[in-house]
Amino acid sequence: MLRRFSSTFKKKGDRESKQNGTASSSSAAVANTNNNDNKRHSKISAARKSSSDDDRNEKKGNSVSPFEKYASVLHASRSPIPNQTGDGAYLEHEHTTSLLQDARHLGFKDFKTLKEVIESKLPGGQLIDDKTMLMERIIQLVSRLPHNSKHREELTNAFLTELWDSLPHPPLSYMGNDYAYRSADGSNNNPTLPRLGAANTLYARTIPPLIIQPGGLPDPGLVFDTLFARQTFKPHPNKVSSVFFYWASLIIHDIFQTDYKNPNMNKTSGYLDLSILYGDVQEEQNLIRTFKDGKLKPDSFSEPRLQAFPATCCVLMVMLNRFHNYAVEQLAAINENGRFTKPADNLSEEEAKKAWAKYDEDLFQTGRLITCGLYINITLYDYLRTIVNLNRTNSTWCLDPRAQMEGSHTAPSGLGNQCSVEFNLAYRWHSATSATDEKWTEDVYERLMGKPASEVSMTELLMGLGKYQAELPKDPSKRTFADLERQADGRFKDEDLVNLLVNAVEDVAGSFGARNVPKVLKNVEILGIIQSRKWNVGSLNEFRKFFGLKPYETFEEINSDPDVAESLRSLYDHPDFVELYPGIVAEEAKQPMVPGVGIAPTYTISRAVLSDAVALVRGDRFYTIDYNPRNLTNWGYSEVRYDLSINQGCIFYKLATRAFPNWFKPDSIYAHYPMTIPSENRKIMKDLGREIHYSWDRPQYTPPRVDLVSYSNAKLVAEQQNQFRAAWGDTVEFVFGKASKEFKLYQDSAFIQKHADVMSKLLNKEEWHRSVKEFYEDITAKLLEDKTRRFGGINQVDITNDVGNLTPVIFAANVFSLPLKSKENPRGIYTEHEMFKVLAALYNCLYFDIDKTKSYPLHHASQAVGEPLGKALEANVKALGGSSLLSGIFRSFRENKNALKEYGVHLTKQLLENGLGAHEIAWAQFLPTVIAMVPAQAQAFTQIVDFYLSKEGSKHLPAIQRLAKQDTKKSDEQLLHYCLEAVRLNDMSGLYRQSETTLAVTDEAVEVTIQPGDKVFVSFAKANRDASVFPDPAEVRLDRPMNSYINPTLGPHGFLSKETSHIALTAMLRAVGRLNNLRVAPGVQGQLKKIPQPGGYSAYLREDHGSYSIFPTTFRVQYDA
């Protein structure tokens, strides 16, 4: 009897392990007196406390009858005597509830929760909004199910799995420089397997060789002669250029370097980490570095094997070297968050040595991450798009292995990569050697061996290569190629490098497929066949089956050419016996397909290479998990980032224009699409409707701009507008299309003077100036009120982004009825901030297009916004004349009338009455005026505020604040002088113009000759501190003659005189001067970061510090209420 009671009340948890989500009884169990009783218990359930369901029911007032509550006990009392086991106990049978029984425990809200859970798991499901408390509702749902519910267990398991999968196990990203930077030998890419993919580790094997091969394989020389040897050159069917295959050579040598002393060893890393540039191991890396400012030795690269390749391979390496050195210069100048701060001067010798070493190391390693980022983006968006023929489409799709995947069945990333012997063979693309490179290789044999390649034995070849390698200087900066000579600074001449690159762009590569390998490479290919046999790699069919491809059943399937198929049959007897390497070379090549097949490789290679590309990139932690702005810096991440709206993501032009800024036009097809020959590119772009986007002439040297810094020359260029015009070239036609003819009239002095005279007669000067002053004061004060954020008793406002940049926008919108969207005009087209960005982009494109790498994207962005803006203005002018169907819409822009709007309407109507057409008014008068005025005024305002809040100018702030509270003509004059002095002392910009004349000038005691067509840049920074013109040049003085100031950006702008800008800036300074205790915001937000640029001007950092702007974009200040 005691045993029966013991088995009756024993806890289930004592019998077996608890399942997820299954609750055990809360009653105390009778001690188990027999360990053998674990599986033999009474059917009577143990007494337990009420479940959550019972609690819920009781709270609802649903009382449970005693008969229901103790039904199991009553049932047991009527049960027959247990006799199912030898010791008189019942066999235990686990009973679970059905779906219908579970559903009875759930409410309507629970079913809604289930629906949301299912929706979140569907493909394309949105991220979970945790404000809906979905996770907590899941907990509620599961807790309401019975303890013996199978669905409770399944839901609990799913919940646990999701929580587990939310975090990586083990973590793949760690803190510290050991993991933040790439190691020299590629180790630590996967921290849990630190030697995976490192240099000097063994090759992996991709497929097991299971097929029993014949005892005697064909002679390698015979294989070459019958399957490999090129009889005639076959140009690539898609006209892919040699540059594509040179880039492929970089990739191949980046991840494969067989140790010929131990061919199972790979001496380089298994990652695309540019070890060809930086070195395979630390000792090699030390030889390429200067150990100063993070730089590499000029025009040098580590990999000596590339010296034996066609010279353009080396040119590409030099370009990457130059980009690295450019990148570290920018990193040091920006110094994001103090990451690259130079050591203090007061350190001890030992401390200083360590600090400078760390400074160099941080710059070098971050520069490497950035340069690798450019390298991989070119590989994915220029090189890979060419492989699959996406360059012949306008599609922005790309097979980017770094894609962020959502869901439970996603491809892992950052796990590492180990190169295999099979892919070492798969990447030998000698068939694609161009006719030019074939001839070059023959000449190399003659020069090194003294006889034709056909007469060079294998022994002689190996000895000759060994001798060549031994004679190469160990110091990369001492090496050269293509008989080029280094200059005094260690660099090669740009002209020599560009000629090699351009020739390669125009050089069509060879075709894949059987009998396309140059005979000059016979010994090289024999070595490859022999090595593949020593590696015991699987057969061609085994390789195909590994990738899910149908194995070849006949030789004709391998290659439909009867002669090639017969040669294969004679050599191998059966398709299963065809070796991997000879097989992938002798296979039939795919025919081009748009998109799909670009480089037309052989069939097996086409599939395998894409898998390897994904493995190489997705397996690399530095291209996936740790590829982010924090590691590359905001500037570095942005600089190498692709833009799908530009060339569908292709970015080779960034490398070309940074390396050779004076050779490639910003829109040169040679820079944008170098992996297909230009003549074929022209056909492609014509079909795509993009032919006009590019220039097609062969790159030529463009003299660098003439930089002038003296006051006399600055004044000359600023005032002689007929001799120095805006350097916009063909830009106006590209941006404004058919309206460009009218826009150019803005530079016609006769046209401007004629209509300025008309305007002066139409305007009441005194009344106009009063209206401008009142408007600017009111709008500035209103923006200060609306945009100020108050927290912790402090008022803070972005005085640049929310006040200085918007005030002239609102002014222009009122005068010219710009389609501005605001609270007052909700039917507008552009918001105030958008309008400023539009006008700033157009100004930059038309008047300050200096950075060639940024020029092409800038032109396309300007084209996208410029023409629509001009058309909107023209429609508005027509509306004022009452002749436009859109007059009702554009009248809404003027619903909120004020004096300035009335002036604008009046002037427009008068111009129409004076015989000017709406098209001419909009494109030759209004649009050029707005583009020139708005950004320039905004820039000047920020320069003024920045100066008087700086250490140098803050002593004048009390006087400005005193004058701001006065409303007299004298206070206006004094405030204007404060404005002009601040601009003089704080203007780091300049003028960029094109000369229309021949002129000889003296600048800083140097004779400079300027020719027609020369680009000229004058910097204001030095000119404005010329002591001969400005006595006490560093001081603010209010008595300087007005005509001594050089500030052409402040006007005149069309019919708006320079006085208009002067009044505007004075009014804005007055409004700001009325703020109490005005000061800069603490920290970086209160710093107007300027980066010095070549030529004596400074660029501003954008708010995210990711790129430069000629206009300030953000500057926060604080003031008291």
Swiss-Prot record:
Residues the record marks as site: Transition state stabilizer: R305
Enzyme class: oxidoreductase
Annotated GO biological process: hydrogen peroxide catabolic process; prostaglandin biosynthetic process; response to oxidative stress
Annotated Pfam families: An_peroxidase
EC number: 1.13.11.62
Consequence the record notes for mutating L384A: Increased synthesis of 8-HPODE, 8-HODE and altered product stereochemistry
Reactions listed under catalytic activity: (9Z,12Z)-octadecadienoate + O2 = (8E,10R,12Z)-10-hydroperoxyoctadeca-8,12-dienoate
Coiled-coil ranges (or none): none
Outcome, altering L306 to A/V: Slightly lower synthesis of 8R-HODE. Little effect on epoxyalcohol synthase activity
Keyword field: Calcium, Dioxygenase, Fatty acid biosynthesis, Fatty acid metabolism, Hydrogen peroxide, Iron, Lipid biosynthesis, Lipid metabolism, Metal-binding, Oxidoreductase, Peroxidase, Prostaglandin biosynthesis, Prostaglandin metabolism
SUPFAM superfamilies assigned: Cytochrome P450, Heme-dependent peroxidases
Similarity annotation: Belongs to the peroxidase family.
Full protein name: Linoleate 10R-lipoxygenase
Species the sequence originates in: Aspergillus fumigatus (strain ATCC MYA-4609 / CBS 101355 / FGSC A1100 / Af293) (Neosartorya fumigata)
Taxonomic classification: Eukaryota, Fungi, Dikarya, Ascomycota, Pezizomycotina
